[in-house]
Amino acid sequence: IKVPIYLMTGFLESGKTSFLNFTIQQDYFHTDGKTLLILCEEGEEEYDPAILEANNTVVEIVENEEDFTTDRLVAMDILHQPERVIIEYNGMWLVSNFEKMQLPKGWGVEQQITCVDGSTFQMYMANMKSIFMDMIKNTDMVIFNRCKQDDPLPTYRRGIKVANQRAEVIFEDEEGELDDIFQDEMPFDMDAPVIEILPEDYGIWFVDAMDHPENYDGKTVRFKARVMKPRGMGSKFFV
């Protein structure tokens, strides 16, 4: 990939612009070359032209999906010759349509990040589940913002992991990232006759089992693992 694409997805007012406004100004995201920011929808929050100019970022706006074409992207590439591209994708456009597109030569998706408004997540899941699932099936990271501690966050996480096991899931409230959200509620049933540990929950279970072994005393736990049998070990033993 010569020109990396950072694809931002999420429904309108999910926090995409806020996230990008913050990220563009960070030292770790700085680059000497030009950044092309393609906006496919406009929410309430806008970009500060001074910040964009200071970070060598140019903006192209594509309002209609039928105008979001390979030819249009090639024209942008020729005009701006960007070192990287950020796409703030329209939440009502299927991400799978973008994935099928032929991109300009040298362009390729480096990372996809999906923003979710925690306060409206359940409503969108009830009314636009197919669009949301299409949005997250190949994303690298899902950021839930505007969360509250009493929201069913483990349930939200499981819903994401069912659709995309490799996605990193982050929860934030107004103060920043939430820590230890599984401290009081594990993402598996502790009262089940057999506690089923999904592969994506293994890390959470392992840490909890090391910290609180008494919680699992006398219980049956099922998880996927690899059995190793070193040489010299007795027939009744394995690692």
List where the protein language model places each region.
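Nucleotide-state-sensitive switch-loop elements of NTP-binding domains
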Residues: 1-111, 115-122
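OB-fold and OB-like single-stranded nucleic-acid-recognition modules
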Residues: 138-239
